[in-house]
Swiss-Prot record:
CDD domains per the UniProt record, alphabetical: NSP3_rotavirus
GO molecular function: RNA binding
Lineage: Viruses, Riboviria, Orthornavirae, Duplornaviricota, Resentoviricetes
Name of the protein in its database record: Non-structural protein 3
Function: May play a role in stimulating the translation of viral mRNAs.
The organism of origin for this protein: Rotavirus C (isolate RVC/Cow/Japan/Shintoku/1991/G2P[3])
Amino acid sequence: MATQASVEWIFNVAGSAASASLAKSIKDAGGSEDFAKYVVARFYDNYKDSIDDSGIYNACMGRARTVDKALNDSRLAERNEEWHTNLATIRRLDLELAELKLMLSNLGMKREERVLNSMFSVTREEGRSSNVVMLKQNAVKMIEEGKLKIKVEKNENYTESLKNKIEELECIIGAFEKGKEINIALDAMTGEVRLDGDSCSYNSTAAFVSTIMGTPIKMYDESNKPLFDVGKYINPKHVIDKMIESEIPIFKSDYRNNESPDFDAWNENSNLKIVSVNDCHAICVFKFENEWWCFDDGRLRKYNGIGNPLIVANSKFQIDRILISGDIELNPGPNALVKLNDCITKYNLKIICTFDVNLDDDGSIMYICYLKVGSAEATGNGCSKKEAKRRAAVSILDQLGM
């Protein structure tokens, strides 16, 4: 089929190239654009009739079918019941193929364009302006045989999330070339978190997408409005769809939701999920070292297994580390840290700050901050380093009379 498709493409390109050349010649000679369009339209109709009536089209397609059959099984390469391919036939086909390549080259269709067209196709998803590049069977076969190497061009101006997706693509290609099972190691992390009792869908989706992207995702603008606002229909499935609409680099091949036909199979093997708890709360759960953990509105704790999966990640994603952000502010209040830093600078005070980590009774991680400023000492507990340090800073400011 590949040769037949190539021949069909050659005829289409030849007609288009000739039409464009004819239109340009008419305009260069002073003809109007309307006249050029009229002549080109008549030419293209005559061109199709000509290659059909002359038998050139059918002859070329017949030879293409012969080549395709010869590629699949030389014994099946029949032109008719009594005719089989032989060395002379192949020589003639090679010569004609070389002539066609020369013709394309003269029309401006260079080798790079011919090769790319034989291996890739471009489709567009309905309702979206972006394009999807698909591998043709010819390219897949060449990858399996080790004849095709895919390199991804890198740029220092790429965002961190895009660099991570490129590295992921390179890992997939490498595993595919070596015939190995594809595994992508991820760091579990949260995105930007907000605690107001209504943001669990945003929080859980932020953790899910941030983990896949490899970088914490920003969820709110300067006015504290959601960047991926879904209005009243707050559901992780709607939030992640909004992210894709906003061209966040997460793809349909990365996950499935509970409306997908193959959801059950994905759910069974997935290591990263968004789970609905009692149909009123959403958390991001993940498997780490054979135990299930979760980010519950930014708090890391052991997962108790309660809930129904809404979104599950591709099983190729595996968690090998947990990153706990020290910048998640769960209960901001007055900015004691800024005030304390001003005092330290103003009075030239020495500061000692260390952190310890413990597991709380419910399995969540609790930070302990030991803070000493001058002669004042205090400790603070919190679900993040920043929260623990802020609470210790409040105590220090009280001791210093500020």
